[in-house]
């Protein structure tokens, strides 16, 4: 298959003078002349074959690397840039060059998310960007430990400065990463600029622009110097350690002779117009008010006040060019920015004044004029009638004298400086003589001084900037750091009139281009060598000849120029003549036809014609030693210091490169001894500076950025083709394309080549299926399909290479146009385009063939259908005709049959009529005969009837007679009947009366039964009330008995305590007199050997009679008397009553059922109730007895109520007496407060007494004896134990161990743990899970220290602060063993540190009664020697804040802390905060705090909030540090498919376990929030990667990503409910939309409705970026995204060009607090969702074993007490 490069009608590019290139169609070939082409305007043009420019295939439209274009030429390049610029893709690669087109608008592609996306990514994976070049330079610097350089070039206004800023921004972010900062999770406000070197470099930009930029014909802010910024990095970490700025090639001639219609440097114009607003003037006015202000400073200001009234037209240097302003620029406002930048760099007011004075002196020096002197060839200074300085002439009586003003400003002698202008000294041997200057030479000496001053000032500013940004010093450059240099230099220039400036600029660009060509050749060579292809015959162009033409000695242009500059009588003509004579034969040098002062140089970017009229003047840079001496002898300290600083820098090799930044002059006063007049040409300085720059660049690995200016109007979306094409030529881009085109610019890996173009040769192999070649091809295809990646083993690559060779042979491609590398195919320019045409044509042919087959199939199917329809239609017609014939025959037969029927009918009618007539006649005859016979018979019958009637009448008369005789005998019978009826009525009335009576009796019986039932119910109710009354009465009696018994016991114990206290105090006083140091032993012996005897706290109540316990108890209670009249009998009795507030938790915790005891039934008065329903009428006697018994019960109830009221009254009186007399005995105890409220209290609560029918009297006695359940003690300790808190200076352990109460505690806990009824056993409700015993309530058991003991231990001796901190240290010290340790509770697991701290300290803040108050004999809480009472709130707050600080110091700063540990401490702070919030809510109406206490509590709350945020950040950092590398590795691994699901879900399982409610007390909503944030982070990371990477933005990558997303969603649904799965999975919606878009037809997105339905979350800007980056798969038949779709998206009203298309990772993990009354919340949850529910009662009821902590705290307290006693004894 032979490829014809021009097969078919192809699209070509036609040159156009206005647009550069336009579209054209190739019509036909004209033999011997070329090709005939028709352009887009319809004009036909003949183009030679060599000039033909073919268009590239559609798939390469808007490609991001133009070296991949099949046809490499200017037209293709400019078209590609236009297409990319239309969609705001301003960056494009051309090989290793990055082309950056200035968009003249702000684009959202420079965010920190974009920086994060480019970090650690290869250039080939991401779209072109300035960050990509920066990343490449940064990674190569660290990986190869070699310095890098980035060369940024372009015209003025092309964006070089902005590009430099973006490079510095990226390097700063990399420096932050080197310090371990995750830049993706920190906002821009969080980045600290303390060591932000790049920010300081950027801030120096206004200074350099003011002193080094000027207005030119093509740019209002053209940089007239080059700068090289070195960013210094640490070799290992990659952090920024410093920076350095070097300047090159300052255009000094612009100071004295700006070109026509251009300006000098901006600073002159800014100073004149903006000095009125200078900060120096404001500061001077303030200094005048200060008596100590120096007079010299005021004199300096006075010298500058002349600036207030001058203008640019007053100075020769500023007005000579005819331009002194810029349209749209206010120089006065720019001056303020410049001055602020100088202040930022650290310049003082005196230094600012010094700068202004030098600038003003330069302007006045420029106003010095000369005239001829009296002697020949002499000159003198012209005084009076000056052409300049009109604003100054009025002030001076003698007229304006610029020389005098200049000398005054510089502090120099007028005579010494004057002589340097008009004459010079020459030495000949030992003699010296003076030579006068001509007027022209005097002007040159004047200008030389001005340029010298300005260049030195510029160099000094650079030195000062370096002092500000160079943190480590240049002396360590070779050893301690690496650097990346950024070169910002003006690009190639070519105007209608080109002078000396353009010559030097183009010379510099020629050198840079030469270095660039060698670098490109080197890169190409490395690529070819890597792939091992034959490249020896490839020729690369070189511009060395042009460089030799300019700089080669002795006959180079620069050498001839310097030679001519030293001859006084040289002219431009003589200069050009020498050039013509020496270089006329050079191919890079031409002589113009019509000019003798011009010459042409053929540069790499094209030919440039130079005008030499000002070459000689601008090349001269005389340095007169007398001028230097005059300046150095100045009495102005600033000027002399300036020269000294520069001299040190130059002698030390620092500063600008070779001093060439502003001229490189090293002359000083020492030069006066050798030569009084030294000539140094600008060109030689320029050459030296350039060579130094090239040496620096050559020592680095260079990278290139070419900035392009799209139009001169500085408008967005305006592209000037011709202007851009010119810049491409000047920037070397076209040259680079030419170099690439000379080699093999098109490259494809074997796998991609086979996949994309296999369909072209598929037909050839298919035609010969049996050949070995076809079999080999099929095996290659299988291997290619199995290995989708570009890599593989060597055998696989070799197999693919064979496949590529087979394809090349089948395609008949010239073997000289192809090179087979190790992994790639290399093609000459145009081959890929032809392959694309063939592929397109093959696809078209295949589509045509498929259409042909399909159309044949459809037509054949239609024909068959038509044929079948026709046959069927014919059959229908035939059937219809046959049916018609059949119907006709049927009708004929029917007619014949009908006729026969009609005839038959007529004959039948006739026969029937005759028959009926005959029959009728016969009937008439027969009737006549019968009538006669009937009449005869009737006459006979009448006669018979008459005879019979006569006979019957005779018989009736006889019977009547007999009846009349019988009637007379029936009258008597009737009378008897009437009598019987009367008797029957009487009997019936009697029966009715008896029935009514029976009914009445029955009704009365029913009423009595109803009354009996009601009375029975009332009886049962009264019996129940009677039982309750008896129970209450008995409980009151038991309570009174217990109170009385406890009083006597307590009185005995108090007496025992007082005696021991007195004995102990006596011992202490005796030992203090002896100056003994054994107080610790005394305290210890007292603590642990004190009163240990325990009396039963409650006596048994009186035993009741077994016959009738209820009535006996009532009788006994009625006979009981209540004593208590004396004060002794009621002393301290109220100490036995426990306050409800102290045991609020126990009362709420235990709700015992109260079972009533019913009295025995009276069997005498009440019959068998079960038989009542069987009795019809209740006997009256039983009813009366029942009514009587009811009255008795009612009366008994009233009696019991009165008795109970009397008992209550007596108990109340007893309690009042106890309260009145409670203070007397306690005041006798030394060291114990007399306030009885501080003592411990005990209360006995009512509990149930169960009395079943099966219970025995022995059980009742045992219940009463054990006090429980009838008298449950809710206190956890005995009164003696509680009193220990008031005698802290003596001991820690209780004076007595209440064995009775401890046994009850254990027994109650036993029943709680075993699920038995606590009402039938003993309990005290302490809730201690460790104090368990058998139900028998044994007194012997082992007691363990609980949290209550720990609280008491902490309060020991009022050393709470010091012992509390010691407790915190113990917790933190054992943090490894304490991690994942939780205290079980009914709310869930509570972290142990949070539980201990909340019970020991946090509770004390909100519990005033439990707060420890210092006693007069106690020390302060810290164990120090303070006196007075210390605020307990402050003590507890300080301990908790100390805990926060220790955790942050030990845990959070430990790099070894894993996620589980961090989650554990996160749960601690979260739990503490929620407990504190619950306390705030519960006690806000009860506590009355002063302002100081409120401030302390608020401080603690803020500290906890801060720690929660820090804990959250640490957890997030640990999570992201694990997940982020996994995602990066999965997305970047080319050897396998994307798979990040397994490692992430495994890690999520760990997080879920660490934060689950089963393990720690973390609110479920907080866990949900964390997972939502985590999934948002995954969504944002992958989304940002897809949006910027071509290898991910394709169909092939979208499938595995979708699978991983589905797996993640499945994991969430599997481990959490619907609420979690819906909200958490919703965080991946943006990623799911992107994946879906990658899979569908992209043309659907043009429709607004479909687009909103497909991707409702995705913004238009993000969608446009996604489609811009999308590239079809190599073997896909899909076309690239049409640019029309992208432009339509950009035209949408919803499109926001300033939108940040990437998701901000720093705003995902947010956790904030709403206000003081609300809890944690975030951007994704409501205000109260994150608040955990805390049950304070449940929390306080939990007892936890802490023996070790108690033991350690006790030991610590003993040490503190001992130390304090020693201190007190010493005092």
UniProtKB/Swiss-Prot annotation:
Domain Dilute: 1427-1695
Highest taxon, organism lineage: Eukaryota
Biased composition (Polar residues): 1077-1111
Ranges in a coiled coil: 1180-1224
Annotated residues for binding of ATP: 154-161
PROSITE patterns: DILUTE (PS51126), IQ (PS50096), MYOSIN_MOTOR (PS51456), SH3_LIKE (PS51844)
Low complexity: bias regions: 1112-1139, 1253-1281
Pfam families documented for this protein: DIL, IQ, Myosin_head
GO molecular function: actin filament binding; ATP binding; calmodulin binding; microfilament motor activity
Domain Myosin motor: 61-840
UniProt xrefs under SUPFAM superfamilies: P-loop containing nucleoside triphosphate hydrolases
Actin-binding, as annotated region: 690-712
Disulfide bond positions: none
Spans annotated as Disordered: 1070-1176, 1218-1282, 1312-1343
InterPro entries: Dilute_dom, IQ_motif_EF-hand-BS, Kinesin_motor_dom_sf, Myosin_head_motor_dom-like, Myosin_N, P-loop_NTPase
Gene Ontology CC entries for this record: actin cytoskeleton; cytoplasm; membrane; myosin complex
Basic and acidic residues bias spans: 1143-1153
GO biological process: actin filament organization; endocytosis
Recorded family membership: Belongs to the TRAFAC class myosin-kinesin ATPase superfamily. Myosin family.
Quaternary assembly: Myosin I heavy chain is single-headed. Dimer of a heavy and a light chain. Inability to self-assemble into filaments.
Function according to Swiss-Prot or TrEMBL: Myosin is a protein that binds to actin and has ATPase activity that is activated by actin.
The name this protein goes by in its record: Myosin-H heavy chain
Species the sequence originates in: Dictyostelium discoideum (Social amoeba)
């Amino acid at each position: 298959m032979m490829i014809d490069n021009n097969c078919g009608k192809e699209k070509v590019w036609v040159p156009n003078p206005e647009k550069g290139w336009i579209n054209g169609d190739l019509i036909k070939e004209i033999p011997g002349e070329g090709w005939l082409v028709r352009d887009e305007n319809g004009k036909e043009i003949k183009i030679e074959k060599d000039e033909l420019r073919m268009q590239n295939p559609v798939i390469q439209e808007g490609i991001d690397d133009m070296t991949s274009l099949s046809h490499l030429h200017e037209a293709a390049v400019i078209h590609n840039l236009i297409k990319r610029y239309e969609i705001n893709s301003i960056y494009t690669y051309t090989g290793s060059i990055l082309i950056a087109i200035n968009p003249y608008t702000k684009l959202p592609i420079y965010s920190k998310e974009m920086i994060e996306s480019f970090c650690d990514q290869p250039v080939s994976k991401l779209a072109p960007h300035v960050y990509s070049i920066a990343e490449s330079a940064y990674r190569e610097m660290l990986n190869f430990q070699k310095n890098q350089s980035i060369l940024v070039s372009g015209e003025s206004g092309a964006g070089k400065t902005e590009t430099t800023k973006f490079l510095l921004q990226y390097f700063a972010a990399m420096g932050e990463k080197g310090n371990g900062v995750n830049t993706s999770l920190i906002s821009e406000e969080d980045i600290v600029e303390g060591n932000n070197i790049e920010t300081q470099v950027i801030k120096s930009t206004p200074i350099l622009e003011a002193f080094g930029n000027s207005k030119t014909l093509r740019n209002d802010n053209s940089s007239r110097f080059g700068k090289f910024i070195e960013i210094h990095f640490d070799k290992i970490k990659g952090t920024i350690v410093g920076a350095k700025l070097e300047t090159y090639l300052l255009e000094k001639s612009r100071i004295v002779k700006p070109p026509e219609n251009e300006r000098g440097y901006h600073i002159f114009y800014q100073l004149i117009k903006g000095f009125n607003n200078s900060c120096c003037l404001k500061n001077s006015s303030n200094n005048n008010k200060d008596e100590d202000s120096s007079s010299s400073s005021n004199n300096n200001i006075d010298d500058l006040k002349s600036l207030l009234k001058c203008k640019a037209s007053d100075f020769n240097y500023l007005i000579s060019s005819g331009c002194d302003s810029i349209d749209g620029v206010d120089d006065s406002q720019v001056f303020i920015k410049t001055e602020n930048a100088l202040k930022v760099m650290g310049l003082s007011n005196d230094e600012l004044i010094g700068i202004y004075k030098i600038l003003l002196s330069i302007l006045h020096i420029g106003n010095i004029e000369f005239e001829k002197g009296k002697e020949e060839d002499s000159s003198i200074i012209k005084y009076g009638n000056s052409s300049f300085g009109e604003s100054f002439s009025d002030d001076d009586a003698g007229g304006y004298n610029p020389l005098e003003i200049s000398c005054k400003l510089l502090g120099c002698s007028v005579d010494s400086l004057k002589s340097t202008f008009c004459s010079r000294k020459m030495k000949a041997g030992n003699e010296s003589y003076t030579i006068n200057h001509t007027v022209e030479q005097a002007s040159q000496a004047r200008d030389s001084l001005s340029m010298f001053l300005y260049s030195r000032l510029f160099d000094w500013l650079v030195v000062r900037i370096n002092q500000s940004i160079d943190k480590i010093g240049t002396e360590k450059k070779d050893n301690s750091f690496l650097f990346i240099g950024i070169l910002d230099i003006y690009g190639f220039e070519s105007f209608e009139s080109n002078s000396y400036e353009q010559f030097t600029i183009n010379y510099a660009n020629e050198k840079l281009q030469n270095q660039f060509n060698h670098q490109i050749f080197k890169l190409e060579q490395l690529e070819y060598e890597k792939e091992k292809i034959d490249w020896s015959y490839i020729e690369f162009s070189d511009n060395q000849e042009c460089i030799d033409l300019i700089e080669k000695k002795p006959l180079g242009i620069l050498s001839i120029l310097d030679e001519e500059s030293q001859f006084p009588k040289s002219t431009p003509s003589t200069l050009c003549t020498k050039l013509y004579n020496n270089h006329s034969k050079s191919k890079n040098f031409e002589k113009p036809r019509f000019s003798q002062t011009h010459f042409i140089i053929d540069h790499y970017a094209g030919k440039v014609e130079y005008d030499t009229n000002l070459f000689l003047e601008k090349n001269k840079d005389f340095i007169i030693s007398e001028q230097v001496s005059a300046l150095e002898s100045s009495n102005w300290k600033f000027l002399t210091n300036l020269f000294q600083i520069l001299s040190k820098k130059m002698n030390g090799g620092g500063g600008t490169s070779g001093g060439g930044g502003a001229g490189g002059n090293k002359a000083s006063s020492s030069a006066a001894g050798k030569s009084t007049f030294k000539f140094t040409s600008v060109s030689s300085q320029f050459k030296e500076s350039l060579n130094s720059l090239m040496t620096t660049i050559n020592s680095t690995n260079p990278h290139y950025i070419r900035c392009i200016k799209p139009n001169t109007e500085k408008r967005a979306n305006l592209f000037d083709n011709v202007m851009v094409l010119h810049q491409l030529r000047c920037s070397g881009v076209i040259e680079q394309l030419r170099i690439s085109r000379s080699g093999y610019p098109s490259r494809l890996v074997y796998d991609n080549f086979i996949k994309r173009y296999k369909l072209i040769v598929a037909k050839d192999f298919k035609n010969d299926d049996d050949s070995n070649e076809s079999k080999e091809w099929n095996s290659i295809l299988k291997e290619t399909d199995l290995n989708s990646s570009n890599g593989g083993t060597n055998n696989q690559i070799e197999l693919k290479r064979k496949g590529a060779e087979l394809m090349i042979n089948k395609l008949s491609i010239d073997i000289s146009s192809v090179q087979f590398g190790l992994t790639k195919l290399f093609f000459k320019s145009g081959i890929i385009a032809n392959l694309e045409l063939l592929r397109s044509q093959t696809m078209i042919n295949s589509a045509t063939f498929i259409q042909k087959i399909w159309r044949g199939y459809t037509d054949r199917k239609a024909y068959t259908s038509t044929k079948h329809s026709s046959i069927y239609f014919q059959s229908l017609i035939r059937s219809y005709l046959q049916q018609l014939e059949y119907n006709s025959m049927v009708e004929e037969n029917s007619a014949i049959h009908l006729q026969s029927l009609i005839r038959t009918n007529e004959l039948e009618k006739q026969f029937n009529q005759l028959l009926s007539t005959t029959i009728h006649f016969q009937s008439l005859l027969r009737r006549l005969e019968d009538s006669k016979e009937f009449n005869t018979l009737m006459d006979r019958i009448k006669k018979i009837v008459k005879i019979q009637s006569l006979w019957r009448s005779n018989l009736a008369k006889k019977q009547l007679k007999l009846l009349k005789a019988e009637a007379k005998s029936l009258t008597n019978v009737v009378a008897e009947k009437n009598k019987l009826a009367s008797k029957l009525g009487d009997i019936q009335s009697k029966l009715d009366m008896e029935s009514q009576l029976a009914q009445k009796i029955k009704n009365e019986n029913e009423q009595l039964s109803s009354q009996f039932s009601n009375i029975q119910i009332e009886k049962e109710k009264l019996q129940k009330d009677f039982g309750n009354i008896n129970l209450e009465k008995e409980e009151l009696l038991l309570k009174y008995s217990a109170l009385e018994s406890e009083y006597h016991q307590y009185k005995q114990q108090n007496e025992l305590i007082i005696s021991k206290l007195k004995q102990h105090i006596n011992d202490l006083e005796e030992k203090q007199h002896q100056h003994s140091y054994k107080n610790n032993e005394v305290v210890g012996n007292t603590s642990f050997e004190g009163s240990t005897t325990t009396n039963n706290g409650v006596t048994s109540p009186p035993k009741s009679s077994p016959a009738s316990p209820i009535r006996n108890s009532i009788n006994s209670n009625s006979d009981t008397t209540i004593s208590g009249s004396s004060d002794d009998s009621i002393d301290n009795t109220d100490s036995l009553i426990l306050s409800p507030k102290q045991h609020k938790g126990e009362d709420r915790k235990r709700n015992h059922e109260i079972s009533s005891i019913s009295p025995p039934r009276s069997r005498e008065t009440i019959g068998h109730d079960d038989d009542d329903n069987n009795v019809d009428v209740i006997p009256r006697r039983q009813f009366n007895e029942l009514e009587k018994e009811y009255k008795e019960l009612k009366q008994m109830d009233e009696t019991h109520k009165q008795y109970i009221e009397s008992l209550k009254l007596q108990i109340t009186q007893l309690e009042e007496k106890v309260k009145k007399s409670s203070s007397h005995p306690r005041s006798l105890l030394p060291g114990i407060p007399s306030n009885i409220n501080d003592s411990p209290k005990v209360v006995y609560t009512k509990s149930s007494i169960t009395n079943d029918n099966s219970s025995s009297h022995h059980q009742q006695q045992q219940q009463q004896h054990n006090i429980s359940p009838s008298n449950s003690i809710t206190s956890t300790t005995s009164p003696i134990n509680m009193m220990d808190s008031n005698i802290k200076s003596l001991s820690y352990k209780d004076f007595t161990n209440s064995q009775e109460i401890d046994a009850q505690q254990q027994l109650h806990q036993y029943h709680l743990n075993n699920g038995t009824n606590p009402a039938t056993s003993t309990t005290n409700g302490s809730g201690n899970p460790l104090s368990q015993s058998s139900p028998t309530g044994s007194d012997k058991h082992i007691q363990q220290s609980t949290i209550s003991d720990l609280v008491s231990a902490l309060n020991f001796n009022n050393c709470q602060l010091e012992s509390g901190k010691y407790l915190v240290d113990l917790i933190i010290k054992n943090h490894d063993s304490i991690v994942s340790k939780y205290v079980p509770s009914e709310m869930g697991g509570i972290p142990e540190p949070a539980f201990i701290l909340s019970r020991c300290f946090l509770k004390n803040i909100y519990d005033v009664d439990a707060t420890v108050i210092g006693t007069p004999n106690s020390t302060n809480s810290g164990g120090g020697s303070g006196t007075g009472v210390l605020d307990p709130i402050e003590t507890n707050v300080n301990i908790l804040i100390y805990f926060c600080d220790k955790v942050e110091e030990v845990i959070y700063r430990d790099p070894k802390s894993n996620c589980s540990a961090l989650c554990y401490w996160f749960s601690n702070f979260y739990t503490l905060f929620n407990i504190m919030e619950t306390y705030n809510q519960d006690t806000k109406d009860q506590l009355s705090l002063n302002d100081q206490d409120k401030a302390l509590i608020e401080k603690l709350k803020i500290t906890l909030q801060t720690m929660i945020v820090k804990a959250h950040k640490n957890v997030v950092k640990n999570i992201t540090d694990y997940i982020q590398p996994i995602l990066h590795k999965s997305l970047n691994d080319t050897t396998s498919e994307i798979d990040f699901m397994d490692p992430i879900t495994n890690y999520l399982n760990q997080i879920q376990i660490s934060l689950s409610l089963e393990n720690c007390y973390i609110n479920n909503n907080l866990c949900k929030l964390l997972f939502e944030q985590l999934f948002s982070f995954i969504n944002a990371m992958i989304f940002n990667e897809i949006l910027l990477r071509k290898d991910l933005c394709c169909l092939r990558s979208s499938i595995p990503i979708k699978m991983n997303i589905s797996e993640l969603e499945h994991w969430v649904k599997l481990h959490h409910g619907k609420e979690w799965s819906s909200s958490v999975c919703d965080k991946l919606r943006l990623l799911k939309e992107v994946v879906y878009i990658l899979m569908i037809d992209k043309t659907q997105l043009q429709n607004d409705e479909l687009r909103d339905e497909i991707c409702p979350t995705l913004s238009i800007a993000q969608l446009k970026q996604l489609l811009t980056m999308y590239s079809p798969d190599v073997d896909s038949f899909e076309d690239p995204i049409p640019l029309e779709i992208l432009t339509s998206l950009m035209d949408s009203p919803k499109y926001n060009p300033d939108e940040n298309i990437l998701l901000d990772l720093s705003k995902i993990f947010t956790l904030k607090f709403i206000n003081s009354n609300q809890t944690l919340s975030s951007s994704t949850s409501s205000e109260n969702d994150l608040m955990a529910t805390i049950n304070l009662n449940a929390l306080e009821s939990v007892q936890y074993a802490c023996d070790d902590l108690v033991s350690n705290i006790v030991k610590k307290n003993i040490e503190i007490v001992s130390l304090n006693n020693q201190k007190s004894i010493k005092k």
